[in-house]
């Protein structure tokens, strides 16, 4: 399973771990709830030996948040915004390599 650390690029603050991703959206698991209806500038590191760039940086709007099955964590769903073709290809490669499926 691919649990990359996800950061707010504007503040440098660690937000949580990527739990799932598609070209349309992502789910992040975090220790505290994230604000809804907010556009975040997100970034996550990529293994340099696999992907053409070191980080995946993207804008995403938080659209839902709920408690995880573990009450110490929260799941937040994001709609990904304005991805370019290279980022879509990287996300599709992540889906294939780490078995993310709808």
Residue ranges and their predicted role:
Residues 8, 46-48, 64-66, 82:
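Beta-strand elements of well-folded, non-transmembrane domains
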Residues 18, 60-62:
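Conserved hydrophobic positions within beta-strands
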Residues 24-29:
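Short alpha-helix capping/helix-loop boundary micro-motifs
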Residues 69-102:
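C-terminal output/interaction extensions
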Residues 23, 65-71:
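Short, conserved beta-turn/loop elements at beta-strand boundaries and strand-helix junctions
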Residues 1-3, 35-47:
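Short coil-to-beta transition motif at edge beta-strands of beta-rich domains
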Residues 11-13, 51-59:
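Short coil-to-beta-strand transition motifs
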Residues 1-23, 96-102:
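N-terminal helix initiation/capping motif
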């Amino acid at each position: 399973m691919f649990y990359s650390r996800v950061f707010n690029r504007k503040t440098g603050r660690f937000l949580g771990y990527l739990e799932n991703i598609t070209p349309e959206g992502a789910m992040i698991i975090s220790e505290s709830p994230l604000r809804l209806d907010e556009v975040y500038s997100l970034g996550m590191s990529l293994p340099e030996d696999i992907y053409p760039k070191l980080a995946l940086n993207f804008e995403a709007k938080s659209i839902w948040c709920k408690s995880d099955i573990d009450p110490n964590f929260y799941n937040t769903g994001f709609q990904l915004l304005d991805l370019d073709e290279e980022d879509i290809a990287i996300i599709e490669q992540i889906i294939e390599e780490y078995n993310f499926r709808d």
